[in-house]
UniProtKB/Swiss-Prot annotation:
Transmembrane segments: none annotated. The gene is trpA. It catalyses: (1S,2R)-1-C-(indol-3-yl)glycerol 3-phosphate + L-serine = D-glyceraldehyde 3-phosphate + L-tryptophan + H2O. Tetramer of two alpha and two beta chains. Its EC number is 4.2.1.20. This is Tryptophan synthase alpha chain. It comes from Neisseria meningitidis serogroup B (strain ATCC BAA-335 / MC58). Belongs to the TrpA family.
Amino acid sequence: MSRIRQAFAALDGGKALIAYITVGDPDIRTTLALMHGMVANGADILELGVPFSDPMADGPVIQRAAERALANGISLRDVLDVVRKFRETDTQTPVVLMGYLNPVHKMGYREFAQEAAKAGVDGVLTVDSPVETIDPLYRELKDNGVDCIFLIAPTTTEDRIKTIAELAGGFVYYVSLKGVTGAASLDTDEVSRKIEYLHQYIDIPIGVGFGISNAESARKIGRVADAVIVGSRIVKEIENNTGNEAAAVGALVKELKDAVR
């Protein structure tokens, strides 16, 4: 059983908290401390952002984090090194990489999939890869035991949902809002209806992200989704607490996890 499946199974019907940070923001050492701290405070799955110069799906908070990481010279290989170091002391917590196709394409799909598996990556989500064109990367990830994770939006067609249901591993990431990460408003009734609809086709967990900014919104989403995904709010905490990132993020993650238990 994969680490992601084990993580959901261990919750015994409870809801997972998936916590996102951008690797290298503010630096590699802090990234590792944040990863361990988030797990200690209740994060069930870690989602690591791969810095990219044109993060079109990300709002301003995560865009700034990517800029800071790129200014530090962080590359995809550095991200894999971070996972490798994390695995020296944590062999249980699932780690998912979230980013854009360009850095993966530059490395080569086969090399990337092999190196990701060796480093201890459990899943990969490339936000700008339509399901219709992802087959070359999907095959390499599958051959190396790494889950290919897909986004589903409110506008995703039924045919595309069916295709994703056949290919997806680990969990499916439902984008609760039209727009970019960090967007403000969240209609939990609409999300609930959509999750119920999606589970007619999808038999793996569905996590909901975009627009979850506090314990109350996490609690509401946790009632209807299998996992609550929080990114911009955590990254903003890093941005606003220079020198005290780990403590600030740890406190936030604990608050969020308490809300979704």
